[in-house]
Regions:
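Histidine-anchored nucleotide/phosphate-binding helix
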Residues: 128-137
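Glycine/threonine-rich flexible loop motifs
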Residues: 119-129
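A short helix->loop->beta-strand "cap" motif at the edges of active sites that frequently abuts
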Residues: 138-143
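Active-site gating loop/helix substructures
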Residues: 59-116
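Electropositive, gly/pro-rich neighborhoods at or near active sites that engage anionic ligands
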Residues: 1-83
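Generic beta-sheet signal
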Residues: 146-148
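Short, catalytically relevant binding-site loops at active-site mouths
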Residues: 119-121, 150-153
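C-terminal functional extensions of proteins
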Residues: 158-173
Length: 173
């Protein structure tokens, strides 16, 4: 819950605690992958979290009304305010490359679990990194989609399980 906490007010409004924690560790250690390792140590995380890329990217969404929203925390607010659903999400810059460790982890996994989580601002962005969708499709491990128990305002309003799965399949290819 702590790492998923999103600030509601002040200068940090809309920011995710986990992202800030990793950003601070990256600044301290000067290396994103090392920061993730340190996060594992600090929080005594069981298992291993492997980032898909170390590149600096911005998540963008094209809404059904044609407007483009840049920035993960701005997307749900814009969708709700404009009453226009997400048409597609993409990364800027395009052509983002994956970390070899991410592709290796996917290829060696017994099971690949997509979800639960924010569909358009957490799950699908990983699929936008070059080579990740290909690795998931070609990996021998079982693929499992775990849908959220409820919709998320500004991302999956009125979505059914079929809509959720269709969105993931669209980006998996």
């Amino acid at each position: 819950q702590l790492l998923q906490y999103r600030f509601g007010n002040g200068r940090l409004k809309g920011q995710n605690m986990g992202n800030l924690f990793i950003a601070a560790l990256t600044d301290i250690y000067g290396d994103f992958e090392l920061a993730v390792e340190k996060l594992h140590d600090i929080l005594r995380i069981k298992g291993k979290v492997v980032p898909v890329t170390s590149e600096d990217v911005t998540l963008c969404a094209r809404l059904k009304n044609g407007k483009i929203i840049r920035g993960e925390s701005k997307i749900p607010k814009a969708v709700s305010k404009m009453e226009s659903p997400i048409e597609e999400v993409f990364l800027e810059p395009s052509g983002v490359q994956p970390l070899n460790s991410a592709v290796e982890a996917i290829m060696n996994a017994d099971m690949i679990v997509l979800g639960p989580g924010s569909l358009y601002s957490s799950i699908i962005p990983n699929l936008l990194v070059g080579g990740i969708s290909d690795a998931i499709r070609s990996a021998g491990g079982m693929k499992v989609i775990v849908c959220n128990v409820m919709t998320q305002a500004g991302e999956t309003d009125d979505y059914t399980v079929v809509d959720y799965v269709d969105a993931i399949e669209k980006y998996l290819g």
